[in-house]
């Protein structure tokens, strides 16, 4: 096999131990200047979780830094190996806890691919609707905390106000505000309530003008532009070399969104645009995510119209070896009772083999690789966590920048530490 060198630059990322060595062997240079090593976090509000940064400073300028992760390690991937495929869905919520349905989706999509299991059209449409509500929910948390980090406190309260509507919708549907565990292999856990669609429609009508309010407060704000424009620039070549995805990649001018390039769940049938930036700075990352919320509203409205036309269609597969039968059947069908008993005591058994699925989560490309040995429990499950990969770009972006800009840089990457450490 011939290995061809790629055209993208090799970027060196320092480790925390390398920066610690600087502190131990810190001697003044020929000009008498001496760097300082600072430990930022893990108990720091602007690291957006339990993230520690080992930072070498020369005055107020960042010489180099290294993320030190693992403080929130939960061993989710290993724990999944000890549970049946269905019982593990609840664990995926705990990774990116701001986008639990995206985690559910990529996990069940990998299993469905492994089993070659079809999903009813109505279930796919409802998945799209819920994934876009999840995207808006996640972006609202990002927008509010990002603005708060740069002292724009009002935006935080406005964003949290709208997020409450989405959490109420999730609670109406699943009984939980954050850890929803609603997706299942072959479809969804149960059908939507009668007032679900009208409630979502009311929210979308209410929400779209609020996005204009956020932009009125920030987009042309002189202080906001001074803190974000031209700061933390990543060009397209570096973004690809670093493995960035999501808005972090698109802000650098790379038009890559899995909903368009590798569509799933019927996304190829929806009309929407993919926001793409040019400068690759904090400001463009902000503009891309804000515009994504508008596009999510557009997709959600299309999904709602389709759901209205699919009334009465199934929300989960009728393959009783994968999905349990309705409870009404159990009372008169011995076969249904047996399927129900076997599914909840043993679980289904995918064939031996492996499968990889990827979707576009609010933070970028989240992937799931499932390996089956033919038993009811997976032999191995690995998640490609976009937060983990996007975070490795921080040393490259922050090098030479002011310490005051580091807080804005972290927020612009939008990491979730539950997903980083998992």
Swiss-Prot record:
Family the entry assigns: Belongs to the complex I 49 kDa subunit family.
Keywords of the record: Cell membrane, Membrane, NAD, Quinone, Translocase, Transport, Ubiquinone
EC number: 7.1.1.-
Localisation: Cell membrane
Keyword Cell inner membrane: no
Protein name: NADH-quinone oxidoreductase subunit D 1
Signal peptide limits: none
UniProt keyword Iron present: no
Reactions the enzyme catalyzes: a quinone + NADH + 5 H(+)(in) = a quinol + NAD(+) + 4 H(+)(out)
Assembly and interaction partners: NDH-1 is composed of 14 different subunits. Subunits NuoB, C, D, E, F, and G constitute the peripheral sector of the complex.
Function: NDH-1 shuttles electrons from NADH, via FMN and iron-sulfur (Fe-S) centers, to quinones in the respiratory chain. The immediate electron acceptor for the enzyme in this species is believed to be ubiquinone. Couples the redox reaction to proton translocation (for every two electrons transferred, four hydrogen ions are translocated across the cytoplasmic membrane), and thus conserves the redox energy in a proton gradient.
Topology versus the membrane: Peripheral membrane protein
GO molecular function: NAD binding; NADH:ubiquinone reductase (non-electrogenic) activity; quinone binding
Taxon lineage: Bacteria, Bacillati, Chloroflexota, Chloroflexia, Herpetosiphonales
Main localization of the protein described in the UniProt heading: membrane
Gene Ontology CC terms: plasma membrane
């Amino acid at each position: 096999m011939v290995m061809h060198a790629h055209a993208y630059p090799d970027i060196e990322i320092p480790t925390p131990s390398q920066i610690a060595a600087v502190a131990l062997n810190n001697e003044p240079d020929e000009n008498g200047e001496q760097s300082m090593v600072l430990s930022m976090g893990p108990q720091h509000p602007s690291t957006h979780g339990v993230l520690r940064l080992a930072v070498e400073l020369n005055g107020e300028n960042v010489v180099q830094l290294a993320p030190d992760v693992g403080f929130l390690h939960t061993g989710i991937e290993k724990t999944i190996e000890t549970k049946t495929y269905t019982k593990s869905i609840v664990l995926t919520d705990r990774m990116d806890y701001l986008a639990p349905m995206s985690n559910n989706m990529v996990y069940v999509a990998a299993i469905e691919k492994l089993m070659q299991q079809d999903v009813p059209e109505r279930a796919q449409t409802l998945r799209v609707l819920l994934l876009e509500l999840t995207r808006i929910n996640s972006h609202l948390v990002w927008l509010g905390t990002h603005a708060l980090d740069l002292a724009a406190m009002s935006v935080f309260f406005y964003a949290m106000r709208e997020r409450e509507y989405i959490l109420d919708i999730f609670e109406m549907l699943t009984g939980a505000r954050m850890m929803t565990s609603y997706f299942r292999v072959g479809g969804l856990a149960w059908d939507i309530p009668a007032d679900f669609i009208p409630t979502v429609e009311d929210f979308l009508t209410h929400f779209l003008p609020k996005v204009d309010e956020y932009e009125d407060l920030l987009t042309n704000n002189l202080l906001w532009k001074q803190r974000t424009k031209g700061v933390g620039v990543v060009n397209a070549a570096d973004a690809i070399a670093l493995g960035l995805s999501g808005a972090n990649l698109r802000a650098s001018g790379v038009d890559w969104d899995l909903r368009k390039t590798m569509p799933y769940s019927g996304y190829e049938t929806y009309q929407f645009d993919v926001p793409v930036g040019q400068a690759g700075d904090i400001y463009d990352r902000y503009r891309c995510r804000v515009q994504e919320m508008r596009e999510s509203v557009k997709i959600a409205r299309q999904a709602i119209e389709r759901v209205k036309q699919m009334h009465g269609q199934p929300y989960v597969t009728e393959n009783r070896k994968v999905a349990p039968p309705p409870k009404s059947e159990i009372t008169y069908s011995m076969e249904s009772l047996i399927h129900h008993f076997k599914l909840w005591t043993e679980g289904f058994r995918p064939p031996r083999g492996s499968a990889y699925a990827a979707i576009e989560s609010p933070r970028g490309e989240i992937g799931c690789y499932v390996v089956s040995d033919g038993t009811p429990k997976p032999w191995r499950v690995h998640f490609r966590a976009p937060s983990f990969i996007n975070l490795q770009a921080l040393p490259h972006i922050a090098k030479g920048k002011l310490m005051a800009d580091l807080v804005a840089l972290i927020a612009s990457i939008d990491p979730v530490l539950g997903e980083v450490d998992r």
